[in-house]
């Protein structure tokens, strides 16, 4: 192999290492059996969720995962492999891929990592059922507002009752 080819592959490995390091999560899938239309639809759904899916050679993935500290993932790099990287919402790839895999049997989730922790297929399925960060924050805000709102209604009722007593 020429030095130029080796340099190109080394650069490709470094690019993938950077993707691993910048991502809050990465989910590895086997896309064997998907049609071009299905892959295009999956990429669109992932893009809308802020996730980027890349098809990367297994040897490059193996080397990049080792360098990035995710060598435990090397067992899942076999066959046609794509990786969905998310730099923002760590749960987004799991949600989109799980939903898509439920509707299309050909997509197989193999494993990945979420916020630095290697996760199994079962763990990915659990994460996929969790509400998003925004949904959790909205629920928390609603729960925090409820007691204040109840006190405000109680004070208003007392004031209204006092006004009725003054009128009589």
Curated annotation (Swiss-Prot):
Cellular component aspect of the GO annotation: large ribosomal subunit
One MF term in the entry's GO annotations: structural constituent of ribosome
Record key words, sorted: Ribonucleoprotein, Ribosomal protein, RNA-binding, rRNA-binding
Taxonomy, superkingdom: Bacteria
GO aspect biological process, one term: translation
Family listed: Belongs to the universal ribosomal protein uL10 family.
HAMAP family: Ribosomal_uL10
NCBIfam families: PRK00099.1-1
PANTHER family: 39S RIBOSOMAL PROTEIN L10, MITOCHONDRIAL
Function per UniProt: Forms part of the ribosomal stalk, playing a central role in the interaction of the ribosome with GTP-bound translation factors.
Protein name listed in UniProt: Large ribosomal subunit protein uL10
Phylogenetic placement of the source organism: Bacteria, Bacillati, Bacillota, Bacilli, Lactobacillales
């Amino acid at each position: 192999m020429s030095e130029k080819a080796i340099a190109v592959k080394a650069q490709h490995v470094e690019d993938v290492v950077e993707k691993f390091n910048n991502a809050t999560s990465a989910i590895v899938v086997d896309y064997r059996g998907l049609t071009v239309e299905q892959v295009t639809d999956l990429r669109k759904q992932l893009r809308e969720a802020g996730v980027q899916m890349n098809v990367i050679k297994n040897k490059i993935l193996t080397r990049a995962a080792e360098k990035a500290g995710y060598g435990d993932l090397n067992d899942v790099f076999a066959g046609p492999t794509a990786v969905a990287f998310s730099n923002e919402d760590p749960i987004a790839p799991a949600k989109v891929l799980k939903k898509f895999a439920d509707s299309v049997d050909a997509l197989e989730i193999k494993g990945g990592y979420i916020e630095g922790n290697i996760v199994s297929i079962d763990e990915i399925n659990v994460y996929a059922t969790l509400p998003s960060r925004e949904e959790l924050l909205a629920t928390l805000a609603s729960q925090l507002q409820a007691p204040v709102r109840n006190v405000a209604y109680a004070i208003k009722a007392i004031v209204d009752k006092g006004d009725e007593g003054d009128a009589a």
